[in-house]
């Protein structure tokens, strides 16, 4: 036989041998059940339909992935390139564990926002956001004036909240944050404390040519040797309004012990005043936030640092509440101001935060809250209030999380989609001619499955996040400043005090 016939026979033998080995030793005939969802969670087509595209001066949600490399190389900061955003009437909630990339998104949002020249307020608790922007010349490049409020930095811009108060209602709201009722049992102490504190504020203002600060009020209160002498001073030398407040406090309770406890609660609230730097920074103002935020191209950074939060958490909440109140009162006199509150849960509880968020929709204050978990929000505000805060945020973004409660929460928000389940099994069957063969049985049926299963939320990769808006959900490529823009440098300094030290070192050199 010709040689090629041997080759053909050899190939045939090898094929039959492989089929025999595969069928008898390799092939897995165990039953299988696979699910094929009608839609993948990475499909952003539906989400894109409800997001705005090409608007300037709206909160960034994601970049347009269809922009060509040529256009990106010509415009790396995307100054003229369209992005996906949401209306300035919206509020957003961003959830993700530490290190998941939330700060990268904040920086990307700020860079995109600065294209519009509109002002913004950003909490910077690490701190690093102001430092990265300033070190890389971004604030100067976009022509922004910055105000850095850091109560524990001696070189920080000083700010006295009372300088921007316009009414009794403004003062009362701040006192609610400064002296909240922590429980039903402590409500009477808080009420009395607020009356005495308000009387003291008005007393100091009336005796200091209209000037008053937390520092001067604290100094006045501790200068009185006892609660009796404080009340006597207010009642004897105060204005009619001060006397009215003292009388109201005395009618509320005639117990000297109760008064002493209430005043002690006021003094305890001012424990942060034992820090001389904080006392100095709260005593006067370098800027009026009310006037500054009416202007374009102003960036305010609230640097209430994480390692000092045990001391300054009440001050942090006080400034957040104060800024929201200011922006509500001057809304008709300004453009949109973007509020970015990172690690809001590190501060003290802000009373009626959910109601406030529902109100600000029409006040030109797009607001994004950044937190580490839904569980933390519930722990801080309670289940009912936490649910209201989440509901007040029309857009939710969730990075990888570590707790199953948050993962299940966002999975449920995404809803379910139809899926085809294909079941496959193999069973031995005898043919008509008596041969034993394996018969494959396939069945198909439809069922509902989670669009984004909880386990996916626990395993999201870096740079990925779930976005939920107007009933649509998708896993998106979340904007990252260091990857998507030329802003790749770190921070050479993080506080105004660091900047002064660098300048002094350079001058010596």
List where the protein language model places each region:
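Feature marks short, highly hydrophobic, charge-poor N-terminal signal-anchor/signal peptide-like helices
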Residues: 1-10
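Membrane-embedded transmembrane-helix bundle of lipid-linked glycan/lipid transferases
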Residues: 9-15, 99
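P-loop NTPase motor domains
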Residues: 18, 22-40, 71-78, 83-365, ...
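N-terminal pre-Walker A segment at the start of P-loop NTPase domains
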Residues: 48-81
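Polar low-complexity intrinsically disordered regions enriched in Ser/Thr and small residues
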Residues: 57-60, 196, 418, 437, ...
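Residues at secondary-structure transition points
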Residues: 60-63, 102, 199, 421
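Conserved ATP-driven motor cores of ASCE-family P-loop NTPases powering translocation/secretion/packaging/pilus
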Residues: 357-359, 363-466
């Amino acid at each position: 036989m010709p040689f090629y016939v041997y080759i053909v026979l050899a190939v045939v033998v090898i094929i039959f041998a492989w089929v025999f080995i595969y069928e008898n030793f390799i092939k897995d005939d165990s039953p299988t059940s696979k699910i094929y969802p009608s839609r993948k969670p990475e499909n952003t087509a539906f989400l894109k339909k409800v997001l705005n595209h090409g608007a300037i001066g709206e909160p960034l949600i994601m970049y347009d992935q269809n922009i060509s490399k040529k256009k990106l190389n010509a415009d790396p900061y995307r100054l003229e390139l369209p992005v996906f955003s949401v209306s300035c009437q919206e509020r957003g909630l961003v959830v993700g564990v530490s290190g998941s990339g939330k700060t990268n998104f904040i920086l990307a949002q700020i860079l995109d926002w600065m294209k519009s020249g509109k002002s913004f307020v950003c909490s910077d608790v690490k701190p690093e956001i102001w430092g990265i922007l300033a070190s890389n010349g971004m604030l100067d490049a976009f022509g922004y004036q910055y105000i850095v409020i850091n109560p524990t930095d001696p070189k920080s811009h000083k700010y006295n909240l009372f300088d921007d108060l316009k009414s009794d209602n403004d003062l009362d709201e701040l006192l609610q944050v400064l002296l909240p009722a922590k429980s039903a049992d402590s409500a009477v102490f808080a009420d009395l404390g607020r009356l005495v504190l308000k009387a003291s504020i008005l007393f100091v203002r009336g005796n200091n040519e209209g000037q008053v600060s937390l520092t001067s009020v604290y100094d006045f209160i501790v200068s009185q040797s006892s609660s009796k002498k404080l009340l006597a001073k207010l009642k004897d030398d105060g204005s009619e309004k001060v006397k009215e407040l003292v009388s109201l406090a005395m009618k509320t309770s005639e117990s000297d012990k109760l008064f002493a406890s209430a005043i002690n609660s006021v003094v305890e609230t001012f424990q942060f005043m034992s820090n001389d730097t904080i006392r100095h920074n709260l005593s006067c103002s370098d800027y009026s936030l009310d006037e500054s935020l009416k202007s374009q191209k102003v960036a305010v950074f609230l640097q209430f640092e994480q390692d000092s939060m045990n001391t300054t958490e009440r001050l942090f909440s006080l400034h957040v509440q104060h800024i929201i109140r200011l922006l509500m009162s001057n809304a008709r006199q300004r453009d949109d101001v973007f509020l970015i509150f990172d690690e809001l849960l590190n501060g003290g509880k802000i009373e009626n935060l959910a109601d406030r968020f529902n109100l600000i929709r029409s006040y030109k204050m797009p607001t994004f809250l950044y937190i580490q978990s839904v569980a933390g929000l519930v722990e801080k505000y309670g289940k009912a209030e936490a649910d209201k805060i989440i509901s007040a945020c029309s857009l939710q973004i969730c990075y990888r999380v570590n707790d199953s409660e948050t993962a299940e929460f966002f999975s449920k928000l995404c809803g379910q989609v139809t899926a085809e389940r294909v079941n496959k099994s193999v069973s031995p069957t005898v043919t008509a001619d008596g041969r034993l063969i394996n018969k494959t049985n396939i069945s198909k049926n439809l069922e509902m499955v989670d669009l984004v299963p909880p386990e996916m939320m626990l395993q999201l990769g870096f740079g990925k996040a779930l976005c939920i808006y107007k009933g649509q959900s998708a896993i998106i490529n979340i904007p990252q400043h260091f990857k998507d823009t030329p802003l790749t440098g770190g921070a050479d300094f993080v506080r105004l005090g660091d900047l002064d030290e660098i300048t002094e070192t350079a001058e010596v050199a």
